[in-house]
């Protein structure tokens, strides 16, 4: 009886587990904007940061990576085009406007009110 229960549970776990496929993300922003001036920086941006780190979705999903990234940028006071890009990416990765607003509000108490205000 116990073996049957264990086998049934194991089958349920296997059937219920979502396996995230690791797909390489293609990014060309670095090369497009900095390729001639700083080719190594562009390569690291496009191939390592986006091509490798962001593509490790089997370790951390894109939605969570977006949450971490926008939180990090706002906490540092970075509200330029980088934040705009990552907020758009966060929406594409399933984060809603309501969640973004709540994230920024939450950050205000840890990173500082002016940084959060600037992010809105």
What feature does the model see in each segment?
Residues 2-8:
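Sec-dependent signal peptide recognition
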């Amino acid at each position: 009886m116990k073996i049957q229960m264990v086998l049934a549970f194991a089958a349920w776990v296997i059937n219920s587990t979502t396996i995230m496929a690791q797909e390489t993300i293609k990014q060309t922003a670095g090369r497009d904007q900095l390729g001639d001036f700083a080719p190594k920086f562009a390569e690291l941006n496009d191939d390592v940061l986006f091509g490798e780190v962001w593509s490790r979705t089997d370790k951390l999903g894109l939605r969570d990576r977006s949450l971490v990234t926008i939180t990090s940028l706002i906490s540092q006071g970075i509200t330029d085009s980088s934040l705009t890009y990552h907020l758009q990416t966060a929406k594409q990765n399933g984060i809603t406007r309501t969640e973004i607003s709540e994230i920024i509000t939450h950050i205000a108490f840890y990173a500082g009110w002016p940084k959060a205000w600037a992010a809105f």
